[in-house]
């Protein structure tokens, strides 16, 4: 389907179909991928503005409009409803041109599974709700501090330590030393355990002072009743709480204030946004973002950060007040949206009062430091890509660089990784994982050369077909913008780096020769021992130094490819090892394996169980019980079969 800009009549007809109502619009490319999601109180005028005066648009949006082949719209009852819908659509589809925030890292959250009788508490980077009752606290910028805090919390409050019981019929050591209340043997009621966990949640909500007062009152009540053992236990919790809150040095005069403070520093291309989280008068969190600032007003950047940040947090993380450095274009709309999300009033202020303005100034100073650091990092990456271009004799600095590595143990669970750097920085949304399919690579036999050749064939076969159809894929090397192409063949690399030496490089080039792409790709390899760079057809490595910027960039790429491959290999190996021997029994699928282990608690117990005991397990009948028993006792079953055979008649 051709872009709408090349079909003026079709474009005009399509624009007239869009109603002047509030709602959301979705712009799609020729492959039906969503490029951009937006909202407006008048869909028709907003969408028309993208195609009326293109000179007023940012370069990013101009690039987007050249690729729009279809426009969809969803009408809503109000602009506030459109804002909530837009947030959900962006969260679900992650359109390329909606990604304002440049950070691809995912901040960690703390999850408490309130839906369970004995809730678990753990750190995660994925906000996936199993139940509406579960809660995510965060995000937290320092995962190390979060881990230390959770470690201390589990020392202060007795909490369940394991997702599953260690022993089926008795408690473990954690119960004996007072670190677990004996959840596995129900030594504590669900109500009492929830009561303890509510205190823990107050720590992560920044309500430490309130919790301290509550524990003080509880300790005094125990002391008045002469229950000194319980009073001492609460006293220890109070002392532990002091240790937990010791790092929260910055505070406000009013200890009841909870607010978020946002400010930015920007130049004509980049903006650094800082978000300080104040809870009960204390600074409990600080989040930093870098954003695309081209042709965007500071207030609009702050508004987009607010929309993206608060669409990713639970209602408990929305404070009653936000302080912002610049006025927001749709401040009232955002207040209504946040109020609906929090279910209590939320106000946004651009403060003039001295105390609040001083807070904004403090956050802005931090944003300026982050902007300087981000710009220095960009300059360093630019120098590195320029140096790499000189090293590989390329006409322009490479934008998209891909690194590949293989991971296995003697051929078992063999996998490969593809990592991507764009402009010298990791682009994790483009990472790929491969399972090695070749039958010649299996447990006990490894062939890294064949594995790497297989990955090259799988990675570039689509490009080989395109070249056979007449696409000049080699010309893409000289466009300097392949990382942003979105014409269906959007992932042509400027450089391919192989982790290994001349052997791996030769295997890769042979595979590319089969695809007729060996002259179109810039390929190199980086040997581990001396950090030597090899090029195809060259017996000697390039003259380079290990600390050279271009070599250092390749080394970072190689190390990231190795890390990604090893982590995927460990995941695959772990999943294989977790698969029970029960899976090999005909008629026993994953659900039945789970039910059997839940009933008998271990493989050993299943192995020792009689047919009668096995048949009493949920979902197991007599016939299947015999099969399971026979699987573990083949000799016994064979003997029974022989005894059950009828004697044959012998004739003289």
Swiss-Prot record:
GO MF term set: DNA binding; excinuclease ABC activity
A Pfam family recorded for this sequence: GIY-YIG
The keyword Lyase is assigned to this record: no
Location of this chain's protein in the cell: Cytoplasm
InterPro entries in the cross-refs: GIY-YIG_endonuc, GIY-YIG_endonuc_sf, GIY-YIG_UvrC_Cho, Hlx-hairpin-Hlx_DNA-bd_motif, RuvA_2-like, UVR_dom, UVR_dom_sf, UvrABC_protein_C
Signal peptide (residue range): none
GO cellular component: cytoplasm; excinuclease repair complex
UniProt record, GO biological process: nucleotide-excision repair; SOS response
Protein name: UvrABC system protein C
SUPFAM superfamilies according to UniProt: C-terminal UvrC-binding domain of UvrB, GIY-YIG endonuclease, RuvA domain 2-like
Location of the GIY-YIG domain: 20-99
Family: Belongs to the UvrC family.
PROSITE patterns found in the cross-reference section: GIY_YIG, UVR, UVRC
Domain of life: Bacteria
Keyword terms, alphabetized: Cytoplasm, DNA damage, DNA excision, DNA repair, Excision nuclease, SOS response
Native organism taxonomy: Bacteria, Bacillati, Cyanobacteriota, Cyanophyceae, Synechococcales
The keyword DNA damage is annotated on this UniProt entry: yes
